[in-house]
């Protein structure tokens, strides 16, 4: 069976089960109080809106996807200030066009832009390198690792691949919750964990996860963030060391209805048609893998106060031990 047909068929089963669970949770009033404010790119509203019924005719139309050159996790502005958004978008415009420089005021912003690009413009992150002593006179240098014409071809292939992911599992009228769960299952259905990657010289990046069928945690997490941002759902990376410091792991924090949730599509690769690691609270995330809450590195930028991004809402708890 074609992978995308499989994704669509499974989406129906997943959404039916998830919506039933969510309605059950709403009826018993489980709720939380995560960080509030304008954290969502899409219009989500209350839980009732998240689970609203979409007309059948609208549900059959393909998702009206258009590539968005400017997407960025909102949490980066908390770390670097509001001005980083425009600086990063200037970088995006330059990098997508294959230009060799972009306006950049200082070294902190220059390094931040390349760090942000890992999950917010993976194709540029994969084919550029950070130069020393940048910027110069307010201009940051962009150096590509492949010939310019080849790079431009890679950019177009990347755009086409993002469209493949999104239109393959989403329909017009899908609300933010549906986009979040559908893209989650699309990744977990189509990717295999690359156990050999850490022993090789492969360049690990979210770009590889999006373009190929094999990846590891930091690649899968970044891929999921980017797909969500492209569909107007705010999400960011999150990582931590295990309590005994024996391993590091990276996953995703997603905002739905003003609440933060932990999503771990990498761990889900080892489960059987379930959502054990979907919509986790801080406590559940800590339990699954023994990653102490105090170790959580929100947006992977070192310095954001984890308590300001607390994930405490338990609406998805019924899913964690459910299989279908």
What are these regions (language model features)?
Residues 2-4, 10-11, 26-175, 289-324:
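N-terminal accessory/pre-domain segments preceding catalytic cores
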Residues 12-20:
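Sec-dependent signal peptide recognition
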Residues 19-28, 228:
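Hydrophobic core
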Residues 122, 167-171, 185-193, 225, ...:
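Sec-exported extracytoplasmic/periplasmic mature domains
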Residues 152-209:
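Secondary-structure boundary elements
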Residues 196-199, 203, 214, 235-246:
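Catalytic cysteine-centered active-site loop
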Residues 219-289:
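Hydrophobic/aromatic-rich core segments of domains that either
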């Amino acid at each position: 069976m074609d992978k995308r047909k499989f994704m669509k068929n499974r989406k129906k089963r997943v959404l039916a089960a998830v919506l039933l669970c969510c309605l059950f949770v709403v009826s018993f009033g489980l709720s939380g109080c995560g960080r509030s404010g304008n954290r969502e790119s899409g219009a989500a509203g209350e839980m009732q809106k998240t689970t609203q019924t979409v007309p059948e005719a609208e549900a059959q139309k393909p998702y009206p996807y258009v590539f968005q050159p400017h997407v960025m996790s909102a949490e980066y502005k908390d770390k670097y200030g509001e001005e980083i958004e425009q600086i990063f978008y200037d970088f995006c415009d330059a990098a997508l066009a294959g230009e060799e420089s972009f306006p950049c005021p200082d070294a902190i912003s220059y390094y931040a832009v390349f760090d942000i690009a890992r999950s917010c413009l993976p194709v540029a992150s994969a084919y550029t390198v950070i130069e020393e002593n940048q910027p110069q006179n307010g201009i940051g240098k962009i150096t590509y690792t492949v010939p310019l014409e080849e790079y431009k071809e890679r950019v177009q292939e990347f755009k086409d691949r993002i469209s493949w992911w999104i239109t393959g599992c989403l329909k017009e009228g899908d609300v933010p919750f549906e986009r979040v769960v559908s893209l989650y299952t699309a990744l977990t259905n189509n990717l295999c964990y690359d156990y050999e990657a850490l022993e090789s010289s492969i360049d690990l990046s979210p770009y590889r996860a999006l373009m190929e069928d094999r990846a590891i945690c930091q690649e899968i997490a970044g891929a999921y963030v980017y797909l969500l941002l492209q569909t107007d759902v705010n999400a960011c990376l999150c990582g931590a060391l295990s309590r005994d410091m024996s391993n590091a792991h990276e996953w995703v924090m997603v905002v739905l209805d003003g609440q933060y949730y932990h999503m771990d599509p990498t761990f889900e690769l080892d489960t059987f048609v379930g959502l054990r690691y979907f919509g986790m609270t801080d406590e559940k995330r800590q339990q699954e893998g023994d990653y102490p809450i105090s170790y959580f590195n929100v947006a992977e930028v070192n310095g954001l106060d984890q308590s300001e991004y607390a994930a405490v809402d338990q609406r998805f708890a019924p899913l964690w031990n459910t299989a279908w």
